[in-house]
Amino acid sequence: MAQVRAGLPGEAGARRQALVGVVGRCAEAGRRLDAEAAALDQVRGLEGPGAGMALDVAEGRFRALAARTVAAHATLAALRERYAPSATDPVTGSVEQAKDRLLFATAHLNATRRSIDAADGDGTARNLRAAEGAVAQAEILVTGVERLATRLREAAALVPAALTGAEAELTAARHGRSRASLATGELNARLAHADGVLAAVREELTGALPYDPLDALRRITRAVDRLDVGRSGVLDTAALLVARTSLESADDFVTVHRGAVGPEARALLSEAARTPVAGARAAFEADTAARAARGLAERDVRAHGTPYPDTTTIGLPGAVLGGILLAEDPDGGPPATFGGPATRGRRHVRAPG
């Protein structure tokens, strides 16, 4: 897909053929999933004997997540006190969305219990799938806050060593050890830029205001990379940490907004995730692509708007944005179900016979 988007292959016919191949493989994967849908239903047995156990598991996950969500709220508040606003931007709204998903899950877990008591197999399966989807997305949102706290601690611990490694790179460049063939004026300009970046980061470290350690690492590694000396291990580590964090953040956002995010953001993120991240240059590319994918995904969500804006059903708009519900029935359903394009919406509300 990267080659197609960049205009390769060069011939229009070859590009069309490449796209036809991609579409064909996707269609075949969908057919295989559709063919296995009935077997998946049989394995889970949500309309019958498997429902009780599946409900117990979902309720257990729900209870654990409710406690983690409270802790994540406190964690995020502490991060906002300690770091610059940009540091927590990737998880802005995550705790609130997790709470919204859990409220939605509560309603459907309760409805599942009532359906089991009424021997309503269809209602049991439909409500339980909706609850499971909401719980799964709440876990992604809460885990994102917890993981970002870890990444920020790792980055803050790495910044001093990254500054030291960057200084060594600058010294090497000043002594003519750059691998790039640069004119003296260009080399001096790049050295001056890198000096300015490092000075700004040092000022942030010693200043009274909070700073963003991941952004500091991004600026350090990219400024020094332009000198092309041959990166030290600590700078590679820093670049990889930044890229990994961007990939994780973008993947979380796309996953919990899959009902609104379009193919462009998905393709770019998939491409970034598949690229082997070995060394700083590859890390820069992955970081850039992941951030671009996140930006495209956010644009898609804004363009989509809030579904069912007048609903009184708690959590319904978020469930539709998240792709938990497919918005094909009047109540926002059916819930997305394991299968391909022809079967993933098979849990429709059945019309009275």
Predicted regions and their residues:
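Long, charged/polar, soluble alpha-helical segments
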Residues: 1-353
